[in-house]
Amino acid sequence: MASTTEVRVYPPDALPPKEAQLAWKIAEMATTPFAIDAEVDDMVANRIIDNAAVALAAINRAPVANARSQALAHPRAGGATVIGLPGDQMFECEWAAWANSAAVRELDFHDSFMAVEPGHPGDNIPPILAVAQQCGRTGRDLIRGIATAYEVQLSLAQAMALNTHRIDHVGHLAPSMTAGLGALLGLAPDIVYQAIGHALHVSTATRQCRKGTISSWKAVAPAHVGKCAIEAIDRAMRGETSPSPIYEGDYGVIATLLDGPEACYRVTLTDRGAPRRAILDTYTKEHSAGYHGQPIIDLAFKMRTRVDDLSKIESVDIFTKRFTHEVMGSGSNDPQKYDPDASRETLDHSAMYIFAVALEDGAWHHELSYDWDRRHRPETVALWRKIKTHEDPEWNRRYDDEPDPLKKAQGARVEITFADGSKLVDEQAVANSHPLGAVPFGRAEYVEKFRALVSGIASDFETARFLEAATGLGSLDSGGVMGLNPVADALVLERAARDQRGIF
């Protein structure tokens, strides 16, 4: 129930008709009604719970608090809610999406998907939820929008690599978010087609945001795209047009940013009206760190029980796939990944740091594991700087050549060499929380993650209220959808009132 289309660059005098363009095919698929099955219904609810958990856990971190203070400058009666703030406070949906997206992304703690282009498809949820609230949509409408967005992002992620051209993975979020909004609102294909052209045109960004000293922009990178997607849909609904063909044009995305004018991509899209189950091929995180590091943390937990004295470690070699080596490993050539003074955003993308701390502590915490004193321990720094990653052909093969997204080997083999020359060797293919892992996440694990992360931030009453709403997602009316962003305790929440620090 899927069809593959070849996407290539055409000269100006031989452009394909609109109906043959990838953006149109995405728009046409997105706007065709489809049946929602129970598994997808449940998983969308799980990801709403997951997003809310990690967002509340990050609620007072500076990038999140500042994004919230920007949203506070844009109130709107009948608008959308902001995570943490009381439900009777509403804001323009694009600004609510901005604030909520930043909160969801900040801790690098929500869902992921690994393909030729990795990504975090849970980033689609905040803008779609914000528009659903402002436009009075139901829980079923919301599920349709979110399931569609996941479908589009995964189709693109499996066909088009952005990272090899140093383009950030949020580039695939622009069409997926826009398609999801079109499905949510029941729009005509031409509106979504025009909006995809707009959103993609302004949302392709370089991967410098994930290189060297990683800045607080990482939290708002998807928020920016979500805001652009909402604005693109609004503009297209008013009859405006956008750059096209955005993929196939000789000055378009493929010709100028990706494989060039001779490129040909094969993109497989779910057929119109077919079930949209791509969300079931994605997975969340048990640990607050880049997804490439999830199995590495779990492997460190396992190996530490066989190490009597960490001070006797001479070296640690992590053999893994290219993505891990270049994005989180020593193959990035970023000295900041070995620097205890580096930003938190940098350290959660340092395989060397997270393996060292996990090996020492046997636990991982979204705050304590990155604490300033924790990262500056002399013994930690000494161990950390003994660790290197290596791109390994076998791990590349197990990742690149496996067609089933869930069966791709994402982990590593670790060799610990001791001062006496002896070695400890072990490997792990996927994280424990992965669908094929030792303890795959189900509804109970999502709920437990939520309860653990919001303890001391949301009241017991609010925790119960939110979980009841989220687990009943498919039956919610438009009023119930307004309750899908949890509220923080007023005594806990910072930046809860509009201020004059910026322009707004």
Residues of each region from the PLM?
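Terminal-appendage/accessory-domain detector
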Residues: 1-118, 217-227, 234-504
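Hydrophobic alpha-helical hairpins/lids featuring a short glycine-rich hinge
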Residues: 100-156
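Short amphipathic alpha-helical face segments that pack within enzyme cores
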Residues: 122-130, 172, 176-180, 291-298, ...
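Residue-level signal for well-ordered alpha-helical scaffold segments within enzymatic catalytic domains
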Residues: 127-130, 231, 256
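Glycine-rich, mobile lid/loop segments that gate access to catalytic sites or pores
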Residues: 132-227, 231, 243-250
